[in-house]
A protein has these predicted regions:
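Peripheral interaction segments used for macromolecular assembly
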Residues: 1-79
Length: 79
């Protein structure tokens, strides 16, 4: 199944407890394979990126695609 990057930008990202973390604002691709490696998520208002298990700053976190459990109407994480 194929999915376009434009379909992912702006989607809500939820953790394993179905709590909203924020929205996808950018995507990182592997140039060789064309596969998504990382999603960049702009966090909801008061979430502190330093309290999350991913690298982040300035209200954004970089989440490896390996931490994504599924893509649907929301992006579901396995953490």
């Amino acid at each position: 199944m194929a999915i376009f990057a434009r379909e992912l930008i702006g989607k809500d990202v939820v953790d394993s407890h179905n709590e909203t973390l924020g929205k996808i604002t950018d995507i990182v691709f592997d140039v060789q394979s064309g596969s998504i490696t990382t999603i960049i998520v702009t966090l909801e208002g008061d979430l502190n990126p330093n309290m999350l298990p991913w690298d982040g700053e300035s209200g954004k976190v970089m989440i490896p695609v390996d931490d994504v459990s599924r893509f649907s109407n929301k992006i579901h994480l396995n953490k």
